[in-house]
């Protein structure tokens, strides 16, 4: 894990989110790398789509909830833009889940469902955090990580016969500028970093779970 205390003032809050994502985000997980390759089994893609639908597909979702609570008033415009984009992402995931068919039969389904519910609740807790910058960091990490997750969704769309749809997120430059401004004090920078770390940890656990399920099916 990145030592944010060492990095301190020398990096912006967005720099910290980006560095955390490179080290601990979805892009670094071997199972996701497999899922976005041509070698991915359709049942594994289906499982991933259904898991993402469970964690991120139900309203309000992290971005919308963070906008609703909006502990950092200066974040509201950026959060609104991200939340609006995720309305489209939820619709896309729902389309993919329908096209992918039922969740593939896998040992330990009850435990999986409990883990996915726990992950969703953890994200809801981040969105409601009263610590200024925490929800901002979680949403910033979600936007950063979603770039890689989108590769999976678009790959699944092609596999299951769905036309990929363009994402509607704010530009990377706009997000970078907003997060840098929102984490411009030592306290808010630490909170942004904490929120981002928690989001990446949830996604890392999700890919670990899906990797274990794929192994159990292939047994």
List PLM regions with ranges.
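Small-residue-biased structural context
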Residues: 4, 28-33, 43, 102, ...
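Alpha-helical bundle segments that constitute or directly flank the non-heme di-iron/ferroxidase center
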Residues: 20-70, 125-129, 133-150, 196, ...
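Acidic, low-complexity proline/glycine-rich segments
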Residues: 1-32, 110-115
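Accessory, usually C-terminal, subdomains that scaffold auxiliary metal cofactors
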Residues: 170-190
